[in-house]
Amino acid sequence: MAKEKFSRTKPHVNVGTIGHVDHGKTTLTAAIATVLAAKFGGEAKAYDQIDAAPEEKARGITINTAHVEYETAARHYAHVDCPGHADYVKNMITGAAQMDGAILVCSAADGPMPQTREHILLARQVGVPYIIVFLNKCDMVDDAELLELVEMEVRELLDKYDFPGDDTPIIHGSAKLALEGDKGPLGEEAIMKLADALDNYIPLPERAVDGAFLMPVEDVFSISGRGTVVTGRIERGIIKVGEEIEIVGIADTQKTICTGVEMFRKLLDQGQAGDNVGILLRGTKREDVQRGQVLCKPGSIKPHTHFTGEIYVLSKDEGGRHTPFFNNYRPQFYFRTTDVTGAIELPEGKEMVMPGDNVSITVKLINPIAMEEGLRFAIREGGRTVGAGVVAKILA
């Protein structure tokens, strides 16, 4: 049979497995891919294919991540699984693999463990919007009351980090049984139930093109007789000729009008998410716009200087700092296209941060940046990346 070409007929959703080490994340990933491949087509993946995750780089940080694809009757999923705990932390903070929803794997035999808690907290901090729970290894627990107790603990933990514990789907099963071809309620049936929960509990993500127009400014040119052209890649939304836009960040917010959109030297009526374009601005001087600002739909994004963030600090081996840093450390924060200096305040009782740590911090920037919760940044010292982070909460 000829190899079928990839046809994107089903809507696409990004998910991933999270949870404590050895609770069965990779086994479950293999089980989902195998069971759904048999049902809806696609490629079954063996455990060792997933476990040997290739290295990739995101924001200057090396991360091991395995990518698996599978389909349900309604959707196409891209699923990420990480071999080690540090990879999860890095993955979630850098947004290397953005998740529309996560599958929290928790062993019924052990109940919630430290990384179970840490991954739920990380999911909350980095803005993973939905969690589904797979209570794994249920074949090892004979006591129904014990299962109920573990389920209750998981729901309480989700509640604690502002996920709707009572409404979260929790599926009981055994990834190992499912992978071995067991057709029973803990085997294949549990995987089908999980697939059903993915389809019904995780809403379709908003497509980038449907968002409010936003384009980070990469370069600014002055073209005689035509005015000022700003180039960059449109992050989301659509810009049409004649529309009003705002220039946000670094300086005071200004209003202007898009009088032209150019791509590959051709004039267009509009540009949309993903396009690399030049946007012509009416009445705006070349010195009024600079790299690091954004063009956006008026009122859709505001400039901020004060926020809390979740950061990962590169270890020495990863090319990071060799020494810890302390309260009031002042590196550069690289947002989208530019560096802004900021001061770091550590959480109470935290003396210092070692290379290789992840930590929640509060930051005050010297210049405002167009910012939303969930925005990613790199932390740099003289152009060298020493960490990565995500805006958890805007304070001012």
UniProtKB/Swiss-Prot annotation:
Positions contributing to GTP binding: 19-26, 81-85, 136-139
Positions of Mg(2+) binding: T26
**Where is the segment annotated G1?**
19-26
One example of the protein's molecular function in GO is:
translation elongation factor activity
Q: Which reaction does it catalyse?
A: GTP + H2O = GDP + phosphate + H(+)
The UniProt transmembrane annotation reads none
Q: Where is it localised?
A: Cytoplasm
User: Region labeled G3 — which residues?
Assistant: 81-84
The enzyme's first-digit EC class, named in words, is: hydrolase
The EC number of this protein is 3.6.5.3
- Segment G2: which positions? 60-64
Q: Where is this region: G5?
A: 174-176
Listed InterPro entries: EF-Tu_GTP-bd, EF-Tu_GTPase, EFTu-like_2, EFTU_2, G_TR_CS, P-loop_NTPase, Small_GTP-bd, T_Tr_GTP-bd_dom
- Region annotation (G4) ranges: 136-139
Q: Which Gene Ontology CC terms are recorded?
A: cytosol
Q: Per the record, a Pfam family? A: GTP_EFTU_D3
Residue ranges of every copy of the tr-type G domain listed in the record: 10-206
Keywords linked to the UniProt accession: Cytoplasm, Elongation factor, GTP-binding, Hydrolase, Magnesium, Metal-binding, Nucleotide-binding, Protein biosynthesis
Q: What does the function comment of this entry state?
A: GTP hydrolase that promotes the GTP-dependent binding of aminoacyl-tRNA to the A-site of ribosomes during protein biosynthesis.
Q: Which PANTHER family match?
A: ELONGATION FACTOR TU, MITOCHONDRIAL, ELONGATION FACTOR TU-RELATED
Subunit (UniProt): Monomer.
Family as reported in the entry's similarity comment: Belongs to the TRAFAC class translation factor GTPase superfamily. Classic translation factor GTPase family. EF-Tu/EF-1A subfamily.
Q: What name is this protein filed under?
A: Elongation factor Tu
